[in-house]
A protein has these predicted regions:
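Class I SAM-dependent methyltransferase SAM-binding "motif I" and its flanking Rossmann-like core
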Residues: 1-64
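A contiguous loop/helix-start segment that scaffolds small-molecule binding in enzyme catalytic cores
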Residues: 63-174
């Protein structure tokens, strides 16, 4: 009991922690600034987490209007969770919100694709894909150098508010 149930082999494993950039951060940086405001990351793998718990998290993200980064979106045997997640999020936001499919980030075959939530095709996604679903305020811009997706932080609302009033007071007046 003093060893905490850890095997001799496990005690010999060295754990090294190194700072880095996560796939969701890389996907956002490569595609604009979709993570410019509140966001969450949800694994769609139900190998260690019951699907009911994952569904609850997706509903919470939808109700909170968070940008959602899905990792472990599909596997060879697990193809239904991403479609279910799409349907859940469409209860909270329109099918026209931008979606980024970021595959093989940092590898020679890296690929960034832009879709909408309603147009998300599960067959375009594999285990090396990070799926980023925009919030209701996220926008896609088609620029001269390609597309970009961003999520505004709301500063424009504060800049447009009448002087001397807080934003929530202004919204109550309208």
């Amino acid at each position: 009991e003093a060893d905490g149930g850890v095997s001799d082999a496990a005690r010999r494993v060295q754990v090294v922690s190194a700072p880095g950039v996560s796939a969701l951060q890389a996907a956002s940086a490569r595609s604009g600034a979709i993570l410019g405001h509140d966001f969450c990351a949800i694994s769609l793998s139900d190998l260690l987490t019951p699907w009911e718990a994952i569904e609850k998290r997706i509903h919470a993200a939808g109700a909170g209007d968070f940008v959602v980064a899905f990792y472990n979106p599909v596997s060879k045997r697990r193809r239904t969770q991403l479609a279910a997640a799409r349907e859940i999020l469409m209860q909270y936001r329109g099918g026209d919100v931008p979606v980024i499919l970021a595959s093989s980030l940092g590898r020679p075959d890296e690929k960034i694709q832009y879709r909408t939530l309603g147009g998300l095709d599960i067959d375009e996604v594999d285990m090396l894909t990070t799926v980023m679903v925009g919030a209701s305020s996220s926008k896609r811009l088609d620029l001269g150098r390609g597309s970009a997706v961003y999520t505004p932080r709301g500063y424009a609302k504060h800049l447009d508010a009448p002087q001397g009033k807080k934003q929530d007071e202004t919204e109550a007046d309208t």
